[in-house]
Amino acid sequence: MFHHVTVLLEETVDQLNIDPNGIYVDCTLGGAGHSLYLVKQLQEGHLISIDQDQTAIDNAHIILKDYLDKVTFVKDNFRNLSDILAHLDIQKVDGILYDLGVSSPQLDVGERGFSYHQEAKLDMRMDQTQTLSAYEVVNTWPYEKLVSIFFRYGEEKFSKQIARKIEAERELKPIETTTELVEIIKAAIPAPARRTGGHPAKRVFQAIRIAVNDELGAFESSIEQAIDSVKPGGRISVITFHSLEDRLCKQVFQEYSKGPDIPRGLPVVPPEYQPKLKKITRKPITSSNEELEHNNRARSAKLRVVEILK
């Protein structure tokens, strides 16, 4: 069983205002920390926990063994949220939570290929049954596409140099391991830049992971479905870990928190002119100093919460 320290555990679930008899969805089961904390608060309620990683689901069966009658596990991508709920014959739920990013077990289990600190085959698939892996991205995607993902998903300012170096190296032989890729990235970045801004491979590894799993596309699709799936008065909690996710989350919530332009002179605002949701957190909630002392991965976490109005 793997060990995972859940970020913003109580804040994320407590912001949902749990109804003991309500139906809730944990779209990112991961290490099952949020699911466990939530399901303990249910009486007649039920929790649907989704993850595309079978390892996470197997692990959660152990962690939640005392609550299995209150949980339905679904192995699927959360971009299919509407279909998942329809298959379970659920019309609306009371709350949904997302904890985006890679769970500690995926980072810590070397063979999954997520970590630039451990040698492993280039993989990075959250769903081990999918075809596209980091190996295909690194060895087959054209230079222009690599530059695009490194810049867009990694905000890497040396995207062109790194992509050019990858292109040159893979012509000699396939790039097969995380260690090989790290050395190529280091060689492509000017020496002064390697000594600042954290690990030199951090941004490229993030970019490849996002591309392999279509993380931003999946989240954008899922959060739109979530907004339509929560009943009025219900809430959605989202933890993001990098600026791309947070920006996307902020934009979607901002869009739905505005109603259409209201004609002047109306004594009351008709329902059709009211926004779909309201923001509970004007500014994102971040980890306390106490949490940061125990979990360095919480440093970049931001929690945004909205309440559905109609």
Swiss-Prot record:
GO BP term (any one): rRNA base methylation
Subcellular location, record wording: Cytoplasm
Record-listed E.C. numbers: 2.1.1.199
GO CC term, one of those recorded: cytoplasm
PANTHER family named among the record's database cross-references: 12S RRNA N4-METHYLCYTIDINE METHYLTRANSFERASE, S-ADENOSYL-METHYLTRANSFERASE MRAW
Recorded catalytic activity of this chain's protein: cytidine(1402) in 16S rRNA + S-adenosyl-L-methionine = N(4)-methylcytidine(1402) in 16S rRNA + S-adenosyl-L-homocysteine + H(+)
InterPro entries per the UniProt record, alphabetical: RsmH, SAM-dep_MeTrfase_MraW_recog, SAM-dependent_MTases_sf
Organism: Macrococcus caseolyticus (strain JCSC5402) (Macrococcoides caseolyticum)
Binding site for S-adenosyl-L-methionine: A32, G33, H34, D51, F78, D99, Q106
SUPFAM superfamilies: Putative methyltransferase TM0872, insert domain, S-adenosyl-L-methionine-dependent methyltransferases
Main localization category: cytoplasm
MF term (GO), any: rRNA (cytosine-N4-)-methyltransferase activity
Gene: rsmH
Function in brief: Specifically methylates the N4 position of cytidine in position 1402 (C1402) of 16S rRNA.
HAMAP family, sorted: 16SrRNA_methyltr_H
Family statement: Belongs to the methyltransferase superfamily. RsmH family.
UniProtKB keywords: Cytoplasm, Methyltransferase, rRNA processing, S-adenosyl-L-methionine, Transferase
UniProt name for this protein: Ribosomal RNA small subunit methyltransferase H
